[in-house]
Structure formats: structure tokens, C-alpha cells
Design a protein with these regions (language model features):
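Short, exposed beta-strand-loop hairpins at the edges of beta-sheets
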Residues: 130-145
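Intrinsically disordered, low-complexity Pro/Gly/Ser/Thr-rich segments with frequent PxxP/GP/PP motifs
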Residues: 83-116
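Short Gly/aromatic-enriched secondary-structure transition segments
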Residues: 74-80
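Short, surface-exposed ligand- or partner-binding patches at beta-edge/loop junctions that are enriched
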Residues: 114-133
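Acidic glycine-/aspartate-rich tracts in secreted/extracellular proteins
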Residues: 66-69, 104-108, 134-138
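A structural motif detector for short, solvent-exposed N-terminal "entry" segments of globular domains
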Residues: 2-11, 17-74, 120-124, 141-155
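Hydrophobic beta-strand signal
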Residues: 62, 79, 100-102
């Protein structure tokens, strides 16, 4: 008799423990996306939208290379719903590295490239960023529907 009652009790305890572990797993524990992909997006630059170059440079999209090799981004495109398109010049992103594509104007440097626009690209109330390979194949996309601290983590 003891064996018969002990087995169901042990099974119930194991099930309860497994269920609580599943519930306790944080959402951020999801596996990091592989390949070249969109990372974090700052679609609403901090502060008031003044269209100053400082404000425009604070609107950006991160492209992350989660491979073990350097990737040449020449010809890759970053596009929004309106059709605004940034085409990468010759730019290599190292293995495990990130590059930020800023809306505003400045000289490209390590980890930062500039769209050189005089107006905002990303809609604060909803938009979709698309990363497109030179072949035209959609590599990754990330969308948002309303302002939420002005950022979206697309990993």
C-alpha cells in the first residue's frame, strides 16, 4: 500500500515542481537569434522631436552579426513602412559585433553608420524595420504598434 500511495505523491510533487519551473522561466531566457539580424531599435529619439541633427542621430537601428565570421554588408538595405531605404556602403561587421544605423548626419565610424537624413524615419506610433539582403531576400523584420519608451528589442 505504501508504494501505491508514494508513487502518485511523488509524481504530483514532480509535476508541481516542473510546472513552477516553467512558470518561473523569464521571457529573456529565449535563445538569441542567429545570423545577421535586427537588434535594438530606438525609434523615438529621447526628448522632444526637434529635427535637430542631435535628435536625428539619437534615432537608430542596430544590426547584429551573431555568426563566427565577419560579414560584408555592402548592398544590404534597411527599410521602413513608408519606403525610406538605407543602403549599406562597403562595411564589414565583425563576428559577434553590432553596428548602429543612425538617422542623422555624421561620418561613418567603427560600429556607427549614418543615413544622413534631415528628417525622422521611424514612426513613433507604429512602423516596421526590414533588413534586406542585396539579392532582395528579406533577412529579418521587426515591428511595433505604439510608443513604449521609444525602443524595441528585436532579438
Amino acid at each position: 500500500m505504501r508504494i501505491r500511495t508514494a508513487v502518485p505523491l511523488a509524481l504530483a510533487a514532480t509535476t508541481a515542481l516542473a510546472g513552477s519551473l516553467l512558470l518561473a522561466t523569464p521571457a529573456s531566457a529565449a535563445k538569441h537569434q542567429g545570423g545577421v539580424h535586427l537588434g535594438k531599435i530606438q525609434y523615438d529619439s529621447p526628448g522632444k522631436d526637434t529635427r535637430s541633427n542631435t535628435s536625428l542621430k539619437a534615432e537608430w537601428v542596430e544590426i547584429h552579426n551573431n555568426t563566427k565570421a565577419k560579414v560584408q554588408l555592402k548592398g544590404y538595405k534597411l527599410k521602413d513602412n513608408t519606403g525610406y531605404t538605407y543602403t549599406f556602403p562597403a562595411y564589414s561587421i565583425g563576428a559577434g559585433k553590432t553596428v548602429r544605423v543612425h538617422t542623422g548626419k555624421a561620418k561613418n565610424s567603427s560600429g556607427h553608420v549614418y543615413w544622413n537624413r534631415g528628417s525622422y524615419v521611424w514612426n513613433n506610433t507604429g512602423d516596421k524595420a526590414r533588413l534586406i539582403k542585396p539579392s532582395g531576400k528579406l533577412l529579418d523584420s521587426c515591428s511595433w504598434t505604439k510608443a513604449s519608451k521609444g525602443t524595441k528589442n528585436c532579438h
